[in-house]
């Protein structure tokens, strides 16, 4: 077998950088513009070019003192010095709208919008409010600002005149009949006190008349309620003998409401006539009333009957005149009181009826629905106007408004009831929280608006708004999680920049991720023709943390010059509210799911909070023709500059192309080595346009066998790693560098030497270009080893292997392994008869009953044989590594020892020689050699028997003992005195038991075993007839030849070295048999044989196979004794006993000894 080598082979491997590594937004050199954090400076940002300068506009909607957060917009110069501060625009100080009062807490700057190509912009204050009666309505307003940063009007498309926008002229009878005048003054003061007097609400004028009318004060004379009350208090009666009411009404309707007297053309006109008598010019009354009708004047008539009642006159004619003066119906516009004092009683009723009137408006039906619309909360520029979100319209259900050329268009309240059911109108869906639009193929445009609180999950609708206010919803998108604020931010994206929308991004910044973290999520929808919006996937921060990812989003031009637009997503709560900005690259089919860059505020040189709360990236602000990105933070605005993108094409060429295994051409560190030179080259290209320095520096470092233990190669004058070097590159050119290295160790020629170069652009001194995403950051060259194999560079070898074992054994005549021999020798010879054999190896496999003790070369040889043990019964040996050269021959001796634990019937040794060189099939048969022999083992066993009864005497009848004879035990013992683990042994016991006629003389009563299994077989039949008891006197032995024997066969368990096993046989002697028999002495012979199972690898010696147990039985005769001898013996015994008793008596043995108390008692009795 050969591993193919080609001398000119190169194997370059390129390693790419990760997707989340920093890309071409320069986060290390940001442009920071600080501002007041308490003003929420950074809430909104807008890139702006106007007046020949580049600015970054920053909204500070909470700017101003506490209680008057008017808000403002700061302009931060970008083209000038880096430390130039931001200038406050003071836009909040201007009078916005037609209000005469300065707005407070309007929060100007919450949204900023670039206007069409005039260098101006629009700043919105959604909380701009105006008072209407006792209510305050936040309709919102947007200020138009020109290129010189001066307000040029405002937009308040939902701001409407208050219902109390009225001009009220009081025509007061001051003739002599009015009495008392103080009651009239009180009536005037109380009536004025109920009116909301303000230049934007109610103005009051007064005409007093008697004989002639007089303008006491005109409509525009007083601006506050206090001024009018003061004038009413100081009003004097004109007096007069006549009451010319018609003339006064004519003057009031023709002069009092005129602009010269402070009248407002758009205000509602109310005339209040107070008189106590019928007019003296009644014939002129129809003309006066006609003039009032022409001037759209609504008339209240108040008849004071005090003069008539005091003189007891009929007031009918007077009341008819006053009813004629009052507008219809009389129930609403006519009053009569009994006297002057009673005027104060109708003040409340009159005030209520006045406030029941509304101003004159063209769109009266929607005035109250848009009062809290908060225009400017969200804005979107269209080609033909501006799209506003009206988040507070329709009781906070929300809506949108399209302003086109001064014409406003918005859907009526019920136009969206299919999407936003009226039953849920109190849930505050906040439609208009975000607005945008998308352009489909074919030129069709759809408006987009988010309602993040709809059903608490959020909703986005794509719709068309027609000229008549009708709405056609093309598709709606629903949020998936309660409280996620789905739809709070919308970002349509034209990825391929063909003018049509390809992707819609919908943010849910409060989406709860794992571990209840407020991670946020952005949903990516593909825009299609068949299915309008199809969910492609989601974007979210990793790992999960509190982020509010998607709080701000901004479409970006093609930052990475790949032809597709990109998008930025803010996450202001990341890293403990420091914030982060994510950059995603667009593709032909959408948006890449992983961020190309994450810019964390924590990694910036300035401490920031809530970085990423707003973002805008459309223009080049620093003048390098590259798009920059503006990002808002708490109290700061940051400008991130784009950096040029270059693409590096590295190459690495090595000379010579391969490393010689045998030849060395130089000396390094005092050793022979192979020297090589590598040419490292870089070709630089770039698609980045603009004015930037096309020359830059790069740092690189090189290493040899970086991940390999042990140094095979090193750089000249250095080690395995080369110190970092700096190289100057230029776009459009190829720059090269020479690297010199050498190889000392060629033994591991299979693995090429790996030369690895890693590189990166050097931007330590100034911001420079970045590498394209497709550019490598390292290159590796694998330099192979070459072989000395002739002109064809192909080594053809012929390995010949011969083996010889010093034992022989066949199946019929196996070799017996006896105790004196424990080893077997195998002589091995390996020879190479052709070309070099590289990486020659010898595989050795041997049977489990062998242990390799040693491998010894037979003669001194320069060829090394080194072996490793992949397993207990295999070896893998390298021979002459790395090259087993032509004609080489090596002989060595393998010494094996027989295993004591594994006993097999055969030993074998198999050897196989191989190399990486090529060997023809015709010579492969001698690459393998095997030798084997059949064997048996002679174990060292000791087989013995011992008995507890060796001789037994049989007593005749009439003597003791009587009954059966004794029970005795014969113990058989097998001891393993060798090293082998022996198994499969069998003990066969032949126990003589039965004589002629089935008479038992011995019988087996019990078998006691330990580590053995025994069975008792049938009685054996002797070669001849069993011996008869009467004939025992003619034989002296009982054995298996003349008796029937009991046979016990025991299979012994495994017997380890130094252990033993025993079998106990309990037998009973039958006295009855031997008492009847005629004999003097005989021997019972029990025979025991130790054998092996069939097919066993054991071979037992004769000495260890047999054992005997002998029992000698002897019959005794009775001895007769004379009767006189017995009688004499008894009498002699009795005489001897009497003599013994007499002697003891004489010695006092039988005398009773008294105790001391008894002696004393006897002495006393005697006395």
From Swiss-Prot:
Example of a GO cellular component annotation carried by this entry: integrin complex
Cytoplasmic side: 1146-1167
Chain positions of FG-GAP repeats: 24-85, 95-154, 361-412, 417-470, 472-534, 535-593, 597-657
S-S bridge residues: 76-86, 666-675, 681-736, 789-795
TM stretches of this protein: 1123-1145
Glycosylation (residues): 98, 234, 336, 364, 733, 763, 839, 921, 1011, 1018, 1039
Residues annotated for Ca(2+) 2 binding in this entry: 558, 560, 562, 566
One Gene Ontology MF term: collagen binding
Membrane topology: Single-pass type I membrane protein
Segments in the Extracellular topological domain: 23-1122
InterPro entries: FG-GAP, Int_alpha_beta-p, Integrin_alpha, Integrin_alpha_Ig-like_1, Integrin_alpha_Ig-like_2, Integrin_alpha_N, Integrin_dom_sf, VWF_A
Biological-process GO terms, alphabetical: cell adhesion mediated by integrin; cell-cell adhesion; cell-matrix adhesion; integrin-mediated signaling pathway
Subcellular location field: Membrane
Residues reported to bind Ca(2+) 1: 494, 496, 498, 502
Signal peptide: 1-22
Tissue: Widely expressed with highest expression in muscle and heart. Found in articular cartilage.
Binding annotation for Ca(2+) 3: 620, 622, 624, 628
Record-annotated VWFA domain positions: 167-350
Keywords assigned: Calcium, Cell adhesion, Disulfide bond, Glycoprotein, Integrin, Magnesium, Membrane, Metal-binding, Receptor, Repeat, Signal, Transmembrane, Transmembrane helix
Highest taxon of source: Eukaryota
Domains: entry comment: The integrin I-domain (insert) is a VWFA domain. Integrins with I-domains do not undergo protease cleavage.
Assembly information from the UniProt record: Heterodimer of an alpha and a beta subunit. Alpha-10 associates with beta-1.
Cited function: Integrin alpha-10/beta-1 is a receptor for collagen.
Family as reported in the entry's similarity comment: Belongs to the integrin alpha chain family.
Name of the molecule in the record: Integrin alpha-10
Phylogenetic lineage: Eukaryota, Metazoa, Chordata, Craniata, Vertebrata
């Amino acid at each position: 077998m050969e591993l193919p080598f080609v001398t000119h082979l190169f194997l370059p491997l390129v390693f790419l950088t990760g997707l989340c590594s920093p890309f071409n937004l320069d986060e290390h050199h940001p442009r920071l513009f600080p501002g007041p954090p308490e003003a929420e400076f950074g809430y909104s940002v807008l890139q702006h070019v106007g007046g020949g300068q580049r600015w970054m506009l920053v909204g500070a909607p909470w700017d101003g003192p506490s209680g008057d957060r008017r808000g403002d917009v700061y302009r931060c110069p970008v083209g000038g010095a880096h430390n130039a501060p931001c200038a406050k625009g003071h836009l909040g100080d201007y009078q916005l709208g037609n209000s005469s009062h300065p707005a407070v807490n309007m929060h100007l700057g919450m949204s900023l919008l670039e206007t069409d190509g005039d260098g101006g912009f629009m700043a919105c204050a959604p909380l701009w409010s105006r008072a209407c009666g006792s209510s305050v309505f936040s309709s919102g307003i947007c200020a138009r600002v020109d290129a010189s940063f001066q307000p040029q009007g405002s937009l308040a498309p939902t701001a409407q005149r208050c219902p109390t926008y009225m001009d009220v002229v009081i025509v007061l009878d001051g003739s002599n009949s009015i009495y008392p005048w103080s009651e009239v003054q009180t009536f005037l003061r109380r009536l004025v006190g109920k009116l909301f007097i303000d230049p934007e609400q109610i103005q009051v004028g007064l005409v007093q008349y008697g004989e002639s009318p007089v303008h006491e004060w005109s409509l525009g004379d007083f601006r506050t309620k206090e001024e009018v009350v003061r004038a009413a208090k100081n009003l004097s009666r004109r007096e007069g003998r006549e009451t010319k009411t018609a003339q006064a009404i004519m003057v009031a309707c023709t002069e009092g409401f005129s602009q010269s007297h402070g009248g407002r053309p758009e205000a509602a006109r109310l005339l209040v006539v107070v008189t106590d008598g019928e007019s003296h010019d009644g014939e002129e009354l129809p003309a006066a009333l006609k003039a009032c009708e022409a001037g759209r004047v609504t008339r209240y008539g108040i008849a004071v009957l005090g003069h008539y009642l005091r003189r007891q006159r009929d007031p009918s004619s007077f009341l008819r005149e006053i009813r004629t003066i009052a507008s219809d119906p009389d129930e609403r516009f006519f009053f009569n009181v009994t006297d002057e004092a009673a005027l104060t009683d109708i003040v409340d009723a009159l005030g209520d009826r006045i406030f029941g009137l509304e101003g004159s408006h063209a769109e009266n039906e929607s005035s109250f629905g848009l009062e809290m619309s908060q225009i400017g909360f969200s804005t979107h520029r269209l080609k033909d106007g501006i799209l506003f979100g009206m988040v507070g319209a329709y009781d906070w259900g929300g809506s949108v408004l399209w302003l086109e050329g001064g014409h406003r268009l918005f859907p009526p309240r019920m136009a969206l009831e299919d999407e936003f059911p009226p039953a849920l109108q109190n849930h505050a869906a906040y439609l208009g929280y975000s607005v945008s639009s998308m352009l489909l193929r074919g030129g069709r445009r759809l408006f987009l608006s988010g309602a993040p609180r709809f059903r608490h999950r959020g909703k986005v609708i794509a719709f068309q708004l027609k000229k008549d206010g009708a709405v056609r919803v093309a598709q709606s998108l629903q949020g998936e999680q309660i409280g996620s604020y789905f739809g709070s931010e919308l970002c349509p994206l034209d990825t391929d920049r063909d003018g049509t929308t390809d992707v819609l991004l919908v943010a849910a910044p409060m989406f709860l991720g794992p571990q209840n973290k407020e991670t946020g999520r952005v949903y990516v929808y593909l825009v299609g023709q068949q299915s309008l919006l199809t969910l492609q996937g989601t974007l979210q921060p990793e790992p999960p943390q509190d982020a509010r990812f998607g709080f701000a989003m901004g479409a970006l031009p093609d930052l990475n010059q790949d032809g597709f637009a990109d998008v930025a997503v803010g996450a202001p709560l990341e890293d403990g509210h420091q914030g982060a900005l994510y950059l995603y690259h667009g593709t032909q089919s959408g948006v890449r799911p992983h961020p190309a860059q994450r810019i964390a505020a924590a990694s910036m040189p300035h401490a920031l909070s809530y970085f990423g709360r707003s973002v805008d990236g459309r223009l080049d602000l620093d003048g390098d023709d590259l798009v920059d990105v503006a990002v808002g933070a708490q109290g700061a605005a940051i400008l991130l500059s784009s950096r040029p993108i270059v693409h590096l094409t590295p190459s690495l060429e090595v000379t010579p192309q391969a490393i010689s295994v045998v030849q060395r051409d130089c000396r390094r560190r005092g050793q022979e080595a192979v020297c090589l030179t590598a040419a490292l080259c870089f070709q630089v290209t770039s698609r980045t346009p603009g004015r930037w320095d096309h020359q830059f520096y790069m740092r690189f470092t090189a290493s040899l066998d970086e991940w390999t233990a042990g140094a095979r190669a090193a750089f000249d004058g250095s080690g395995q790693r080369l110190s970092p070097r700096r190289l100057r590159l230029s776009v459009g050119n190829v720059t090269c560098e020479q690297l010199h290295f050498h190889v000392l160790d060629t033994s591991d020629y299979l693995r090429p030497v790996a030369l690895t170069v890693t590189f990166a652009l050097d931007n330590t001194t100034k911001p420079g270009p970045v590498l394209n995403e497709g550019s490598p950051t390292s290159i590796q060259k694998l330099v192979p080893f070459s072989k000395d194999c002739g002109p064809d560079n192909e080594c053809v070898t012929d390995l010949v292997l011969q083996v010889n074992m010093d034992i022989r054994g066949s199946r019929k005549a196996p070799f017996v392994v006896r105790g004196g021999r424990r080893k077997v020798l195998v002589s091995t010879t390996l020879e190479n008869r052709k070309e070099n054999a590289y990486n020659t190896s010898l595989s050795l496999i041997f049977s489990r009953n062998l242990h390799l003790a040693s491998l010894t070369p037979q003669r001194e040889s320069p060829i090394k044989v080194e072996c490793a043990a992949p397993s207990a019964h295999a070896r893998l040996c390298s021979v002459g590594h790395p090259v087993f050269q032509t004609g080489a021959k090596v002989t060595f001796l393998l010494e094996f020892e027989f295993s004591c634990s594994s006993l097999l019937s055969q030993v074998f040794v198999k050897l196989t020689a191989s190399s990486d060189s090529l060997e023809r099939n015709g010579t492969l048969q001698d690459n393998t050699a095997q030798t084997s022999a059949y064997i048996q083992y002679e174990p060292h066993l000791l087989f013995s028997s011992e008995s507890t009864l060796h001789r037994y005497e049989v007593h005749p009848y009439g003597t003791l003992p009587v009954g059966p004879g004794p029970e005795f035990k014969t113990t058989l013992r097998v001891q393993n005195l060798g090293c082998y683990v022996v198994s499969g042994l069998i003990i066969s016991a032949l126990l003589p038991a039965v004589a002629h006629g089935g008479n038992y003389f011995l019988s087996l009563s019990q078998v006691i075993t330990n580590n053995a299994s025994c069975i008792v077989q049938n009685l054996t039949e002797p070669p001849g007839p069993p011996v008869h008891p009467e004939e025992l006197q003619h034989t002296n032995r009982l054995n298996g030849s003349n008796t029937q024997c009991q046979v016990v066969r025991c299979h012994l368990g495994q017997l380890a070295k130094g252990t033993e096993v025993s079998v106990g046989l309990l037998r009973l002697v039958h006295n009855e048999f031997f008492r009847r028999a005629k004999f003097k002495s005989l021997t019972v012979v029990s025979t025991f044989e130790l054998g092996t199972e069939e097919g066993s690898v054991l071979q037992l010696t004769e000495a260890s196979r047999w054992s005997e147990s002998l029992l000698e039985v002897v019959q005794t005769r009775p001895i007769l004794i004379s009767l006189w001898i017995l009688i004499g013996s008894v009498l002699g015994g009795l005489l001897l006993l009497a003599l013994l008793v007499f002697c003891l008596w004489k010695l006092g043995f039988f005398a009773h000894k008294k105790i001391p108390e008894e002696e004393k008692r006897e002495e006393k009795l005697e006395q």
